[in-house]
């Protein structure tokens, strides 16, 4: 399966290392880079994480914008300028940069949340708060997922 699914909470050690869930690493197995690309979410106080192929899709979408527009500059700065490549070590861990940990409020634990083509890394209590609001929105908007056929 090529989709990031489920939620996991893993510890972050004193060297800022955290183990990426094995099934997430399996999804990334087809990527050319043995690791992930991480950048601060522009929607939430979390870290968005993906493979090189998704970054390429984002690049293509951003390049459709006017090259001198504020929007394009903002997206390029926030996604590409703030992105970091995180290599897996022999145990499937990555080292989270302090800037990303600070953005997400992560200290001793990290909550991995599958979002299909990406996954997010949250401070666990912050994710629980977000989950409550997401459940309400999903319930209110559930009819938008009807089959259009």
UniProtKB/Swiss-Prot annotation:
The keyword ATP-binding does not apply. PROSITE patterns: SPOVT_ABRB. Keywords: Cytoplasm, DNA-binding, Repeat, Transcription, Transcription regulation. One of its GO terms (biological process) is negative regulation of DNA-templated transcription initiation. It is found in: Cytoplasm, Nucleoid. Its main location: cytoplasm. It comes from the Bacteria. Residues 7-54, 83-126 form the SpoVT-AbrB domain. One of its GO terms (cellular component) is cytoplasm. Gene3D superfamilies: Transcriptional regulator MraZ domain. SUPFAM superfamilies: AbrB/MazE/MraZ-like. The keyword Transcription applies. It holds the Pfam family MraZ. CDD domains: MraZ_C, MraZ_N. One of its GO terms (molecular function) is transcription cis-regulatory region binding. NCBIfam families: PRK00326.2-1. Belongs to the MraZ family. Forms oligomers. This is Transcriptional regulator MraZ. The lineage of its organism: Bacteria, Pseudomonadati, Pseudomonadota, Alphaproteobacteria, Rickettsiales. The gene is mraZ.
């Amino acid at each position: 399966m090529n989709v990031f699914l489920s939620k996991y909470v893993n510890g972050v050690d004193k060297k800022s290392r955290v183990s990426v869930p094995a099934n997430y690493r399996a999804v990334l197995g087809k990527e050319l880079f043995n690791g992930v690309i991480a950048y601060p979410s522009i929607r939430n106080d979390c870290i968005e994480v993906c493979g090189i192929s998704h970054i390429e899709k984002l690049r293509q979408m951003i390049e459709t914008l006017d090259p001198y527009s504020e929007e394009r500059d903002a997206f390029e700065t926030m996604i590409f300028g703030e992105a970091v490549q995180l290599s897996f070590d022999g145990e499937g861990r990555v080292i989270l940069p302090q800037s990303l940990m600070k953005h997400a409020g992560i200290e001793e634990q990290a909550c991995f949340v599958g979002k299909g083509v990406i996954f997010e890394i949250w401070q666990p209590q912050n994710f629980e708060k977000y989950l409550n609001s997401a459940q309400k929105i999903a319930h209110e908007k559930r009819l938008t997922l009807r089959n259009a056929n």
